[in-house]
């Protein structure tokens, strides 16, 4: 009888753990969704809270890490922010990529961070590589946050080449962008800059 009681208690415990994991999974997904809602409403501090909750419940949620990165990156564009926020964004994008190497949005976020950081030329080289990785990754992730077209991504790549002093590569990319989208204002402005 004692053996049956022990088995019953163990089974009850195991089943409750499965239910807890399902609950945590649902709650982490809900927090991730809430984070993107807050992000899209430009409430970056609340987005951070929601994404942090999601990650604490499920550290493997690539898009929650990605959301943390984009929220930090968006906050870094506010005056009087410091390099620590950029570093947090970078770490979040790297965590997103570790969880899912096909997360092209996280690769683009990482490229943005490296471009903004500008500590050394290798930042621009790494940003270009991140863009290449994004272009080779899952296209379903594209255009969800802060980018409207593939042209925008190529323009970022062109800016990186420009800052590396590789104006020929930068100009080549801009010409390609303008062939497909002759009215693209960013590409037109960069072309003028490259003419100097």
Question: Can you say where each PLM-predicted feature lies in the sequence?
Answer:
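Alpha-helical segment of the N-proximal tetratricopeptide repeat
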Residues: 26-57, 77
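Flexible helix-coil transition and linker loops at the boundaries of alpha-helical arrays
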Residues: 20-24, 56-62, 95-105, 135-150
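Short coil/turn linking the two alpha-helices of tandem helical-hairpin repeats
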Residues: 69, 74-81, 111, 116-121, ...
């Amino acid at each position: 009888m004692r053996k049956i009681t022990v088995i019953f208690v163990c089974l009850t415990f195991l089943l409750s753990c499965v239910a807890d994991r399902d609950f945590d999974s649902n709650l982490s997904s809900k927090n991730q969704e809430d984070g993107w809602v807050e992000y899209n409403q430009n409430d970056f501090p609340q987005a951070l809270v929601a994404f942090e909750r999601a990650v604490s419940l499920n550290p493997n949620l690539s898009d929650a890490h990605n959301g943390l990165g984009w929220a930090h990156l968006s906050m870094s564009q506010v005056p009087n922010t410091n390099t620590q926020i950029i570093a947090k964004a970078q770490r979040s994008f790297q965590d997103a990529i570790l969880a899912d190497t096909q997360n092209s949005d996280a690769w683009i976020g990482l490229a943005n961070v490296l471009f903004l950081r500008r500590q050394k030329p290798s930042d621009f080289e790494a940003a270009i590589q991140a863009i290449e990785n994004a272009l080779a990754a899952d296209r379903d992730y594209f255009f969800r946050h802060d980018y409207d077209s593939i042209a925008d991504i190529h323009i970022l790549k062109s800016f990186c080449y420009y800052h590396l002093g590789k104006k020929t590569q930068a100009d080549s990319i801009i010409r390609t962008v303008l062939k497909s989208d002759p009215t693209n204002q960013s590409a037109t402005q960069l072309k003028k800059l490259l003419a100097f």
